[in-house]
Regions:
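Cysteine/selenocysteine-centered motifs that mediate thiol-based redox chemistry or coordinate metal-sulfur cofactors
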Residues: 215-237, 402-426
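Sec/Tat signal peptide C-region and signal peptidase I cleavage site
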Residues: 14-18
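HKD-type phospholipase D/PLD-like phosphodiesterase module
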Residues: 19-93, 101-270, 307-395
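Sec-dependent N-terminal signal peptides
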Residues: 4-13
Length: 426
């Protein structure tokens, strides 16, 4: 009898015992950051800064133009390079994509080639303000149907009963297969793969993992039941209830709007526990901004990086880029003026190049964590939008984010004192 039990244990897949994603086989987690390679853009004449010094150009590899894309994506460490590598792999048989926007020519070409080879493709995109009746059709996605009409399905979601934007950022390779690949990011499938400042997270894991099955659930629920918030919640929860694997402890996933409250609770818990918080976001308001106000009142050290659109929206008292002056004034009043250690990435507002990262790093007395994902740190991201958020404690991933944050804060970002006095774009 004992021999029989031992034999059964040996035959049982190691994955049935996994409680961490890193326990599953295979496991690979590769965080990549766009870190664009850009020309030096000089001012016509040197510009005076707030502290009275002068600068001759915008910060190199921070301020970029579309002409810089080719060099940026040619590197094998570029997120776009890795996306195309995944799409083009001979073992890729089916792809799920969910994004707010989709326009990358290089990725579109790779997807077309894949479809021509027989790869099935399902895409979910935001459909604009009247998605159900008159969706705004995406030219790049619709064009892919010409590569294989019966293999490409495009679904438009968002801005219907109880819902905001379809703002997920997910690519899934071979959903439901023995081995699956999941990509989640701050960036859209646009210049977010190249010259925006973004994070892209590439994971290879077992199809048996909760993580893999949950991502399959969310995209299929968006396609099949994403017409209203209630229908989506019912479908997603029903699908997840059938997953036999436990949710992993080293990477927890939250899908808004269903899991928004749980995600906020996790961030609040981590913020209160942390001895240092380092964060960056494109938009920042609502419950998370209120949490940071409290943490500042509690004398919690916080470092924060914003797009310089926020800085200029306050200085010029007008909306700049994709940020609003109302939001910017509130960030200054409630956070920056109360001691939040803030710097800015000087991006190119003329071409809507963005600091589009949204992540927080929590340093605890022992270990640390990263909170990241698709959504901005706003009320809508946790209550209305389709979003995917993650709380990660895998040491190697936390270390990678710490290293990148140091690069941003110490080398690439500009303090308020060093910002140009006048609004000049070379």
């Amino acid at each position: 009898m004992k021999k029989t039990i031992v034999l059964l244990l040996c035959l049982t897949s190691i994955n049935s015992w996994a409680v961490k994603l890193s326990d599953y086989k295979p496991f690979k987690f590769e965080p990549l950051f766009t870190n664009p390679v850009c020309a030096t853009y000089a001012y016509a004449t040197p510009v005076i800064t707030t502290n009275g010094s002068t600068v001759s150009s915008k910060p190199k590899n921070v301020y970029c133009k579309p002409s810089d894309e080719e060099a940026s994506v040619a590197r094998n460490t570029s997120p776009q390079y890795r996306i195309i590598e995944w799409v083009s792999d001979k073992d890729t048989k089916e792809l799920y994509l969910a994004y707010l926007s989709f326009s990358s020519k290089n990725v579109t070409a790779a997807l077309c080639n894949a479809v021509k080879k027989g790869v099935k493709l399902s895409i979910v995109l935001d459909g604009g303000e009247d998605t159900l009746n008159h969706p705004v059709l995406n030219p790049s996605a619709e064009g892919l149907k010409k590569c294989g009409e019966n293999l490409v399905k495009v679904t438009y979601r968002g801005s219907t009963t109880g819902l905001g934007y379809a703002h997920n950022k997910i690519l899934m390779v071979n959903p439901g297969a023995k081995v699956s690949k999941i990509l989640f990011s701050s960036g859209n499938m646009t210049s977010g793969t190249s010259i925006n400042h973004e994070n892209w997270n590439f994971i290879t894991t077992s199809g048996d993992s909760y993580f893999s099955q949950a991502h399959k659930c969310v995209i299929e629920s968006m396609i099949e039941a994403g017409d209203t918030k209630a229908n989506f919640a019912k479908s997603l929860n029903a699908c997840r209830s059938l997953i036999k694997a436990e949710q992993e402890t080293d990477i927890q996933v939250f899908f808004s709007p269903v899991d928004g409250d749980k995600a906020l609770q996790k961030v609040t818990e981590a913020g209160n526990k942390a001895k240092l918080i380092e964060a960056m976001s494109h938009r920042f308001s609502g419950a998370l901004a209120a949490l940071y106000m409290k943490l500042l009142d509690d004398k919690k050290p916080i470092k924060f990086i914003l797009d310089d659109d926020i800085y200029w929206s306050v200085k010029r008292r007008e909306n700049i880029g994709r940020n609003t002056s109302i939001e910017a004034f509130k960030i200054y009043k409630d956070l920056i003026n109360k001691g939040m250690n803030t710097k800015f990435l000087q991006t190119n507002q003329n071409v809507f190049q963005l600091q589009h990262n949204k992540f927080m790093i929590f340093t605890f007395d022992q270990g640390g964590a990263v909170f990241n994902g698709a959504g901005n740190f706003t009320t809508a991201a946790f209550t209305k939008n389709f979003e995917n958020f993650y709380y990660i404690t895998i040491p190697e991933v936390v270390a990678a984010y710490n290293t990148q944050y140091d690069l941003y804060f110490d080398k690439m970002a500009t303090s308020e004192e060093e910002m140009p006095r006048d609004y000049v774009l070379p």
